[in-house]
Amino acid sequence: MLLKVSSCEPLVPIKQWIHTSQLDLSDSSSLVADLLYNIIKFNFSGLEDKRAIFTGYESIKRYTIGNEMFLQLAKDGFALPVSMSYGLFLEETDTLELRALPRSEGLHRGCEVLVLRLDSPNELKENIREWSSKFMNSKASQKQQMLSPETMQKVDLAGRASPRYQANDSWISKKRNAPLSSISQYANMPENYALNTKKSKISNENDTIFKANFQQNKYESLHAKQISASDLSLHQEFVSASIVQQPELNSLLTSQSKNSTPSESDSSSSESSSSVSDSSDLSSTSDSSSGDESSDTARQSSSDTISSNNVSVSVSLNTANEFSFPQGTFKAENEAVESEVAPSSSTPPTVEEISYLHYDEPSQYYFSSPSKLSSETTKVHRGCENTEKPSEEGKNFTTPLSDSVESENTWSNTLRSSVEDDNTGVSDDNKKSKLNAEFDGHVNNISVRPPGSGSSATKARNLRRKKARILKRLMQESNDTFSANESTVVANVPDSYLTKNDEEDSASLASLKVAPKYVSHPVSLSSNSFHTEFPIGSLMRFTVMDLNPVTCTPEISEKTGRVVDCSEEKVKIQLDLGDRLDLKFDVNGEVIRNRYGTTPDEELIEGIATYEWSSLSNVHKLELTN
C-alpha cells in the first residue's frame, strides 16, 4: 500500500522527508515510513497498536515535544475524517494521500485531521516509545490520583473547621475579599497589628496560630458561662501557654501599663512583670466597676486575653469571622464601638478598641468575647444573615421583588380603569393616550396590545403570501408564461377573493405539480466513450462519494452539474449551487476553510470539481424537453 505525501497551499515547511513524493509503507527500514505506518494502523485497524497518536483538540493538549504538523488523509480526491471507519475503504491496492495542512486550517478542522509533533528524525524511535508508555500509564495514574467520596468529604470538613494558611507565612482569613472599615484606623497601628499584610518574624508562627486557634475556640466554647475573678488567672495561663509572645507587643503593653499603674512602672520591663501588672490592673478595674458584675467580668476576660499576648488578637479577629451574625443583633454595641474608634480620632486605637474592629460589610463583625461566640441564639449559618421576619402584608414577596409587586398593582389598576372606560363609553384614542401616559417610563414597559392582533408588518406579510398563492393558481389555470405586465394581476385582485379560507388555498396548492424540464437518459458505465457522450456544456446527473456542502464530511450523494472539460479518465463539472461547498473568506478575499488538495481558489469559488469516471455511478445525461 502506497502513501502519497503532499502539502496544501501555502506550503508548510516541515522537515526534509516531506518532499518525498511517495513512501512505501512496507519498507520498515525507513523511520518515517514506520511512524506513518503506525499512524495508519492505529486509525484503521481498530486501535490494535495502542500508540499515543490521537486526533482533535484533546490530543493537542497531550503533546509538548517537537514541531506541530497537521495531516489529512485523502482517497480518490476527497478528504477522509479520522472519525470514519477506514477499514471499509482500505485495500492492499489503495493509494492514500496524506496532506499537510497549515496550522490555522488544521485548528479549524481539528476533529478531521491527524496531529503530529516531531523532533529530529534521529529521535523518532524514542518519541514513539515515550508516547506509547505515556498512553499506557495515563489511565493508571488518573485512577491513583482520584480521591474517594469519603476522603473528599473528610478533607472538606477539615478545611471548613480549620483556618487556612499558606506556606509563605501569609495568614488568610475565612472571609477573603472583605473590605476594611477605614484605612486611617490601620495607618497608625504597630507593625504586629497589621492584618494579613506582614510576614511573621518567627518561623513557626503559623503552626502556633493553628494550634492556638483550636485550643482557644475549644476552651471558649466550654467556658461560655461567666468567668469569675478567681478563674481569670487560670484562663490567662491556659491561653498564654500555647502562644508565643513577641517582644515588640510586650513593649507596647508595658508602656500602656505604665500609664495606667504608675506604682508598678519600674517592674514592667520584663515579660513576667508586664503580665503581673496587666492582671493587677484588670483586677482593680473589676473591683471598681459599677453595674452588672457578670458582664464586666466577661469583658475583662476578653481584654485580658488580648493584653496577655499579641497573637490572640489576630486569632480572635480571624476566628470570629467564621461566624455570621444577623444584622441588627448587636446594633447598640456596634454603634458605641464606631463612636469610640472613629476615623477622625487623632490618637491611635488602644488594645481594647482593636479587639472590636469590624468591617463595613453587614453581619461580618469581629468579637473576642467568648459569650458572643458560643451563643446558640446568635449563631446563624452562612447565607441566612437576614433573619428579620417579613410583614404580614408582603410575606409572600421578598425585598428584591418589591418592584414586581408594584408593577402588578399598577397593571391591575390599569385594567380596572380600562374596564371603567369601556362602561363609560370613552373612545379608543383617549384610552390609548391614557395608557401611554400611565406606562411612559415604566420599568417593565408592558405592552397592552391583546395577543393575536399582530403588527402591521405581520399583516402585510400574510397578505403578500396570499397574493402569491392566488397568483400561482391563476397562472396554473391560464397556462400562460409569466410576463412583466402580469404583476398588475396581483394588485387588481379583489379583497373578497383574498378573504377565502386557507383550506381551499392549501387544497389548490397541493394539486400543483411542476412539470419536469429535463429528461434523463442513463449512460452505461461499461462504455469507454464518456468524453463523446458528454461534450462540453452538457448536463449530467451522477452519484459520487464526496464531501457534504455544509458539514464537509464524506457522504454518498447525488449531484447535478454542467460539464466544463472531459477526457477519457476524468471529467470537470461545474456543480449546481446546492452542491457547492460553503466557503469562508478572510479580509483579503482568500479562502480560509474547506481547501482540499491543490484545487485553485477560482475553481472552488465557481463550484468546479474534478472526478474520475471510475468513482462515478448512476450516471445520467439530462436533456431539455420541448
Curated annotation (Swiss-Prot):
Compositionally biased region (Polar residues): 396-417
Chain's role: Component of nuclear coiled bodies, also known as Cajal bodies or CBs, which are involved in the modification and assembly of nucleoplasmic snRNPs. Required for proper pre-mRNA splicing.
Consequence of gene loss (knockout): Leads to abnormal trimethylation of U snRNAs, and defects in pre-mRNA splicing including of genes involved in quiescence, and abnormal Cajal body integrity. Leads to an increase in cnp3/CENP-C protein, lagging chromosomes and abnormal mitotic and meiotic chromosome segregation. Leads to an increase in the RNA level of genes involved in meiosis and rRNA, and a decrease in the RNA level of genes involved in cytoplasmic translation. Decreases mating and sporulation efficiency.
Protein name: Coilin
Molecular function per GO: RNA binding
Biased composition (Low complexity): 260-292
Keywords: Cytoplasm, Meiosis, mRNA processing, mRNA splicing, Nucleus, Phosphoprotein, RNA-binding
Signal sequence region: none
Gene Ontology, cellular component aspect: Cajal body; cytoplasm; nucleus
GO biological process: meiotic cell cycle; spliceosomal snRNP assembly
Similarity-based family: Belongs to the coilin family.
Location of region: Disordered: 253-309, 382-433
Locations listed in the record: Cytoplasm; Nucleus, Cajal body
Complexes and interactors: Interacts with tgs1; both proteins are required to maintain Cajal body integrity. Interacts with U2 and U5 snRNAs.
Taxonomic superkingdom: Eukaryota
Primary subcellular site in the record, as a coarse category: cytoplasm
Record PTM Phosphoserine, positions in chain: S148, S162
Basic and acidic residues bias spans: 382-395
